[in-house]
Amino acid sequence: TDIMNDVTNLSIIDLAKESISMYSNLYMCPVYGRIAAGQPNWAEECIEGRIPIDPELMGIVNPEEHFFLRVNGESMNNVIKNGAFALIHKQDTVKNGEIAVVLVNGDTATLKRFTKKDDIVVLEPDSSDSEFKTQIYDKTTPIRILGKYVGKMEINN
């Protein structure tokens, strides 16, 4: 009976170690407050939670350079649904046509397809709703790229 208990205990310990090692590669990616996917909305700097991601599985080299933003609106619904989490890589440049988190006027952020030509910045929605219009800014409006959209996590209700 003592031997049987030792075997049982050993199995439980081994299983626990295996479970821990299976999850040891997870990165707890921060989730920042909601972001507008319509007209730019106030940029929130608060972390509202964290979502575990497996950087290796997702092909992410530096997970600490990533964060999630909760999408609020329908202007990008062909790409990402309202309420979903947009995975963003922190970077200050993107190629024309890529989707970016853009800070407009220093205090409002939006998720849009980004294009820059000369001194003109174009932020374009990608929506099934024609109500959303392209936003065009000249050099008098401060524009700063906060990051590039690289993926999403959608919660099915």
Spans of model-derived segments:
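Glycine- and charge-enriched low-complexity intrinsically disordered segments
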Residues: 116-157
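Short, positionally conserved secondary-structure boundary motifs
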Residues: 1-82, 109, 143, 151-157
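Structural motif
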Residues: 84-85, 98
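Short, compositionally biased
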Residues: 98-120
